[in-house]
């Protein structure tokens, strides 16, 4: 079998690995890069139409966001995931496509004035719908045979509703090898969802390392800390604006706010309004409510058994339309605004930042990881002004973080997860971490007695009876400058053309042995197309 590391190697976003085994080709995740591009993701070395399927570890866009593009370029296989992941992707991929279309439309309106070449979205709502139709959802802990010699199982990893590690059994030449892809390993004691499941055996492990160089410390008093932030901000007459990931983090915060209101922890503002200003978050909250309770932790199941909705509180309001969103900032009553995206790169949160960043009485509260190069990271690093919608905005609001609130395991959590394997895996491949973090965590595992390495994007490894051998090193050339938007779009469109060419070649090979009359007509059509475009 062969594995090609395509994305999220020595960086955190854009997860994608190609597994070629038992005569099949499967991608494990197909994610979009977000924030600063450190190492260029490598193109998939085969035409999308030649890929048999995709295994999705969870619904976050940095793990699934390029699935519509894969379909646009010719992929027609199945996408395998847990049932909650399939449900969440049905809303998240539509939302991502909407953002792609909106941004392309905005750039084209702006470009008309300067005579710029029109741009097209990376993918469309139609592409997202086509990808969603390919999903197949499964329960946890159920073995699924993808093909003879290829069996998988999803195991709860406690990162997000529906998140999973994926066990893969590959049988070739009468010998079975077990791979485990960790997915994003969850932090302990998160509200609503269960803690990560520890697996016992694997030959080769592919594990994330987001926080492989640090410890979260003792579990914070999330409810108490959040209540203090709300109290001092409301006492100043300001809003608490929370850039929040629509799926997972928003529901956790609603869980905390319900408890704050239930216990009366904010004095003098007991009925403060809480706005969910994200259509995606509203839909995600509905999916959380409709999910099988077996996916939730013991405390959440206990609340449900008492008839208590764990993510509902007095004063909760939702904003679906753009007009409803605009009205939030017209209301001067102190309030909580939960809006996406969590890293402030897109979505309605940018409008709320524009209206609240310059107000010293307000607080911008970050509650999740902020990738290098994102607006969120810029703000927590102390920027004094930022540009939003072409306008310079002075940063006068209080900027703070709810520390320790993370969906990712820290160094100790990662070590607990990997140390559960007995005996130790033959090799651990470290992925999904910032450049230096991957190096540090690889050394940590080496010191613990593991054989570990951190491949770069483009690396290829062959696994056989003799073990794992690197047959191609990945690229270590850093991206010094993000390519221009136009160049990036052009590269995407050209890649579609290349994929179409590869698909055409497959169709030609498939027609070998056909009737001469049909083959001649097919050849004439191809030649006519070539004559038209050979310029």
Model-found features: residue ranges?
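A polyampholytic, Gly/Pro-enriched intrinsically disordered region
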Residues: 100-105, 292-306, 469-495
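A general structural motif
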Residues: 185, 218-223, 314-324, 343-345, ...
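His/Asp/Glu-rich metal-coordinating catalytic cores
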Residues: 1-55, 60, 64, 69-252, ...
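Generic long, charged, amphipathic alpha-helical segments
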Residues: 387-418
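Conserved acidic residues
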Residues: 52, 203, 335, 362, ...
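Hard-cation-handling environments
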Residues: 229-374, 387, 422, 437-439, ...
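Short, surface-exposed amphipathic charged segments that create phosphate/polyanion-binding patches used
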Residues: 150-154, 287-295, 415-416, 465-475
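Short, compositionally biased "basic patch" segments
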Residues: 191-206, 293-300, 370-396
